[in-house]
């Protein structure tokens, strides 16, 4: 804005007069009076240059408006103070157009561009601000100083108005499109405050012609340097921010358009109908008749729409008041009228701006709400329509149920794919690909069924299985996933065939006359990383043709052994890895029964469920080893299973081969667990049990007939001797390895070291057929018994430590209880000694004692010998109830016969209660401390408490009912005789009574900081408990049950409604039933 002002200053040079001295002097005088400080020898501008006086002036008008004044003698400090002053003026209500610029007070004497007119203009701006500030101070309630004389500023205002009128004169209207474009381009939005320009107004000069015909409006002239850049320019216009009514024509145009009012236009010197002497554009010079004829021509020349515009709009400048013609343009009435109109316009403009701001805020918030609702609606539509992106993202966030279902589905697909594999390589690839993607568990491995194609290939094409490959693709993978066992196991099995008739009975004798053909039997390793469980005593049994469930239940397919063609015995996955196997081994294309092998492992004698069956097998194996000196051990590789398949089809072999399982030791795992993958593979390979055949059997195999041509059924069974007299009893027993201890603590490190030392690693040589190693069950049993004794010793020590710890805690709790009870009894004793007056009784049975009455008379009490029988029946009575009676009689001297009878009945009841307590005290003296903690909850005490309640009820009923007169002497004699029978000190009896009573009254008192269960009476302990503090009820979680249906109330996961009715816990159902039955609920 400074640039355009400069341009105008160059194009329109105006002589600048100095501001009136009266206004300057009045402003200086007023500032000195208000602030109390003098300008001194400085002039007006120099005195205000540092801004200190201005800030103090503001604080004097409204205290605290300027909080901090910078008093440093630097130009920057002066600018800071002036900025604070202008900000405070805004808070007082002054507008931006009424304030001077911070640079107006700067010293420009040393500048080459400085002119006298420029300095005068800046000084006038400061005086105008002081004028408006004084006007605001006059109306400020917090200001009590001298008021500014506004009349002194009339000369200044008249001078500014005159100069403004000269600039607004039509003679100075410049039709220079270049100047207008230059002014508009320099009017930057970022540097000037936001306001409506002329082009946005209703009466824009575009109505009269194109943009090039615009004239700078007075609004532009008056606000020439409002953007803060015009202060230092050399030729800025002198008419900015004057207190005149014509400086805000924008508001007048906007409001007048909205309300259809014919206001006096602010720009009264612009061309209009009534002002024909002013400059009028060429089209308006036409006559009225000519305008109708040539409307299209000038409309085409001035409007971009050409002839399409049938009419032209009338500017607000063309509308005037009717009486405006009678007013002189420069009259005082006209001036006052304009001021009034301007004030109305200001108020309406402020209201309009507020309404606009509120509307924008409402519109913005409503728009944001609509946008949010629209986004939510679209999101729901995408969800309902199944958008792929959202559905995929939603699928990526799965619940636990979905994860479990997906895992089960994957495992099921693995089972089906593995079972339907056509080749060994395909099955292996299926399993490997699954293990690479997912984690496979033991249950999944156990549930896998060997592909049928592989089972048939082992029986139909045995030559294909004679390679050195592992017949089971799971073996290598299983070995990688399992840790190495840490023990050595040696097993020997003797295999003999049986006759057809004998094989039909499971326990029939096997004929030894058949040629013996050895058959490989897989030796299965244990899984030492599982914990032993007594519930795992049941041995798992697996079949080749059966499906094995996860719980060990076997689904067997019924197979007839007489007329079917059976597959050769093959090793399923479960047989290879689980350690417990059962193999039915029929021979191809025969009608013989299925031969089976039973392999018995001697188990330790610790599990009772396995002890009986294992001991018999151990004895038989031991006898068999003694009677078979020619048995040998020869290790065989894994692919000997295929060699066995070929050997099963051969017939009439004269060589008897008794294969045995060699002793294999698997080295334990390293402690650090940092073995490389190659080492782990080597260790996994050592897990495989190698079986070997006799070399004689191999020679016979070479000379034997081709496979699939033998019709003889080769049956395998364990050769067992029943007794020491060499009587051999052959049993057809199924192959079954009992390996229940594979998860036991037998594989602890201490036992591992011992086993490793006793059983060094054996590396059998296939070329030495005579190499044999016997398995001594006695040595094995001794070693296991020793281990068992060690475990029992450790368990016993642990048990002893736990018992000692519990005993110490129990003793500590008892001590705390005794200390607490001692303190409680001590307090009770002190209270009784302080409140109760002891009675001194005579040992004589005929005691005469007097009860003093308030009137000073004495009532003699005579003994009645007829009441002695009743005394004996009542037993010993404590002194406490009688003292209560004495005190009552002493306090109520004028008692009637009714009250005496009530006292007599109460003493009788107290005697009965004391008798019960005397019996209970003997029971309480027992040495069991834990019984003492529960003595108040015994049936006797509970009955006593209930009886006391009934007595109180009966007493209250007796008070209101009339009684027959009773002999007063008899009553007093009864009382005295009862008291005399107690030849014990009353203090002692009182103490005992208070002790027993206090114990009965507080059954739920804290035991070493722990509450007693309200149901069972035992301490709550450290377990879960339900506590109701407000009712002093405490329950174990197992005791927290309904008193009617006995249902648990504390096991609900979603919360339980518990009602307490008649002292019993009620569940919600029982409570509703009792309410519907009509039982009242006590408060």
Curated annotation (Swiss-Prot):
Please note every region of biased composition (Polar residues).
Answer: 478-512, 640-657, 991-1006
Q: Which Pfam families match?
A: CH, DUF4757, LIM
Q: What GO CC terms are in its UniProt record? A: cytoplasm; stress fiber
Low complexity bias (residue ranges): 462-474
Record region (Disordered):
1-22, 185-248, 291-311, 462-512, 625-661, 698-725, 759-779, 987-1006
GO MF entry, a single one = myosin II head/neck binding
| Listed Basic and acidic residues bias regions | 229-248, 716-725
Name residues in a coiled coil.
Answer: 356-424, 784-835
The record's PANTHER family line, in alphabetical order, gives:
LIM AND CALPONIN HOMOLOGY DOMAINS-CONTAINING PROTEIN 1, LIM DOMAIN ONLY 7
Tell me the protein's name: LIM and calponin homology domains-containing protein 1
């Amino acid at each position: 804005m400074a640039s355009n002002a400069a341009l105008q200053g160059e194009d329109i040079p105006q002589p600048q007069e100095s501001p009136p001295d009266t206004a300057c002097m009045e402003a200086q005088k007023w500032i000195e009076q208000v602030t109390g400080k003098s300008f001194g020898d400085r002039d007006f501008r120099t005195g205000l240059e540092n801004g200190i006086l201005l800030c103090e002036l503001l604080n004097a008008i409204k205290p605290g408006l300027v909080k901090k004044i910078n008093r440093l003698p630097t130009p920057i400090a002066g600018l800071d103070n002036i900025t604070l002053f202008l900000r405070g003026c805004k808070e007082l209500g002054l507008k931006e157009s009424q304030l001077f610029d911070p640079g107006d007070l700067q010293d420009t004497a040393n500048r080459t561009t400085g002119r006298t007119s420029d300095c005068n203009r800046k000084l006038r701006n400061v005086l105008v601000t002081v004028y408006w500030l004084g006007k605001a101070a006059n109306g400020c309630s917090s200001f009590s100083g001298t008021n500014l004389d506004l009349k002194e500023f009339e000369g200044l205002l008249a001078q500014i108005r005159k100069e403004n009128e000269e600039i607004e004169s039509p003679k100075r209207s410049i039709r220079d499109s270049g100047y207008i474009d230059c002014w508009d381009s320099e009017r930057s939005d970022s540097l000037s405050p936001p306001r409506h320009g002329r082009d946005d107004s209703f009466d824009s000069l575009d109505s009269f012609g194109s943009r090039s015909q615009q004239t700078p409006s007075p609004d532009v002239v008056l606000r020439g340097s409002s953007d803060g850049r015009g202060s230092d320019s050399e030729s800025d216009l002198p008419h900015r921010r004057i207190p005149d009514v014509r400086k805000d024509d924008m508001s007048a145009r906007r409001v007048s358009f909205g309300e259809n009012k014919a206001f006096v236009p602010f720009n009264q010197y612009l061309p209009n109908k009534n002002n024909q002497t002013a400059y009028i554009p060429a089209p308006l010079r036409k006559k009225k008749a000519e305008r109708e004829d040539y409307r299209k021509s000038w409309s085409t020349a001035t409007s971009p729409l050409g002839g399409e515009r049938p009419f032209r709009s009338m500017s607000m400048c063309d509308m005037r008041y009717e009486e405006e013609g009678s007013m002189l343009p420069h009259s005082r009435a006209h001036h006052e009228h304009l001021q009034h109109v301007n004030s109305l316009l200001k108020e309406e403009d402020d209201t309009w701006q507020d309404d606009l701001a509120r509307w924008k805020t409402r519109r913005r918030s409503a728009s944001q709400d609509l946008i949010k609702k629209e986004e939510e609606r679209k999101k729901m539509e995408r969800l309902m329509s199944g958008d792929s992106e959202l559905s995929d993202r939603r699928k990526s966030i799965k619940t636990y149920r979905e994860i479990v279902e997906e895992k089960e589905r994957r495992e099921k697909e693995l089972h089906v794919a593995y079972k339907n594999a056509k080749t060994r390589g395909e099955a292996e690839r299926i399993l490997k690909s699954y293990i690479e993607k997912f984690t496979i568990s033991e249950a999944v491995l156990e549930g896998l069924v060997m592909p049928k194609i592989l089972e048939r290939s082992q029986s139909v094409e045995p030559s294909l299985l004679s390679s050195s490959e592992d017949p089971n693709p799971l073996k290598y993978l299983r070995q990688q996933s399992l840790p190495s066992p840490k023990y050595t196991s040696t097993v020997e099995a003797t295999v003999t065939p049986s006759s057809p008739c004998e094989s039909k009975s499971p326990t029939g004798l096997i004929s030894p006359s058949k040629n013996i053909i050895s058959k490989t039997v897989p030796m299965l390793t244990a899984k030492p990383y599982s914990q032993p469980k007594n519930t795992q005593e049941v041995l798992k049994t697996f079949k080749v043709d059966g499906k094995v469930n996860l719980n060990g239940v076997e689904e067997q397919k019924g197979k007839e052994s007489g007329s079917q063609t059976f597959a050769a015995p093959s090793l399923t996955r479960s047989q290879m890895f689980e350690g417990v196997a059962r193999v039915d081994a029929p021979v191809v294309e025969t009608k013989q029964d299925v031969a089976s092998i039973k392999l018995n492992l001697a188990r330790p004698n610790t599990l009772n469920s396995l002890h009986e069956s294992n001991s018999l097998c151990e004895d038989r194996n031991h006898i068999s080893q003694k009677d078979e000196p020619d048995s040998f051990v020869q290790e065989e590789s894994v692919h000997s299973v295929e060699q066995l398949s070929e050997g099963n089809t051969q017939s009439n072999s004269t060589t008897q081969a008794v294969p045995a399982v060699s002793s294999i030791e698997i080295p334990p795992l390293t402690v650090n667990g940092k073995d490389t993958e190659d080492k782990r593979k080597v260790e996994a390979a050592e897990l495989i049990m190698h079986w070997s055949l006799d070399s004689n059997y191999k020679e016979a195999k070479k000379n034997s007939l081709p496979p699939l041509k033998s019709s003889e059924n080769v049956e395998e069974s364990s050769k067992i001797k029943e007794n020491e007299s060499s009587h051999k009893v052959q049993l057809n027993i199924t192959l079954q390895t009992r390996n229940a201890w594979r998860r036991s603590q037998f594989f602890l490190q201490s036992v591992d070291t011992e086993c490793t030392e006793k059983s060094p690693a054996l590396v059998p040589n296939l070329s030495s057929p005579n190499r044999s190693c016997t398995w001594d069950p006695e040595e094995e049993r001794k070693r296991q018994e020793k281990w068992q004794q060690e475990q029992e010793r450790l368990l016993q020590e642990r048990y002893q430590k736990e018992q000692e710890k519990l005993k110490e805690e129990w003793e500590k709790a008892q001590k705390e209880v005794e200390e607490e009870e001692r303190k409680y009894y001590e307090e009770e004793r002190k209270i009784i000694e302080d409140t109760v007056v002891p009675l001194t009784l005579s040992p004589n049975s005929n005691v005469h004692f007097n009860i003093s009455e308030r009137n000073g008379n004495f009532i003699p009490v005579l003994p009645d010998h007829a009441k002695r029988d009743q005394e004996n029946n009542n037993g010993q009575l404590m002194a406490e109830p009688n003292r209560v009676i004495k005190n009552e009689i002493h306090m109520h001297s004028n008692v009637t016969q009714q009250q005496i009878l009530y006292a007599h009945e109460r003493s009788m009841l107290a005697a009965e209660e004391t008798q019960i307590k005397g019996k209970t005290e003997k029971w309480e003296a027992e040495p069991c401390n834990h019984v003492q903690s529960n003595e108040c909850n015994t049936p006797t005490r509970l009955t006593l408490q209930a009886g006391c309640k009934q007595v109180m009820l009966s007493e209250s009923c007796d008070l209101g009912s009339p009684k027959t007169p009773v002999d007063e002497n008899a009553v007093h004699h009864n009382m005295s005789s009862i008291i005399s029978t107690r030849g014990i000190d009353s203090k002692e009896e009182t103490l005992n009574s208070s002790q027993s009573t206090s114990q009965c009254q507080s059954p739920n008192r804290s035991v070493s900081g722990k509450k007693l269960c309200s149901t069972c009476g035992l301490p709550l302990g450290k377990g879960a408990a339900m506590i109701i503090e407000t009712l002093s009820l405490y329950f174990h979680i197992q005791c927290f049950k309904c008193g009617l249906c006995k249902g648990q109330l504390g096991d609900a996961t979603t919360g339980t409604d518990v009602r307490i009715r008649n002292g019993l816990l009620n569940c919600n159902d029982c409570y509703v039933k009792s309410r519907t039955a009509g039982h009242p609920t006590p408060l």
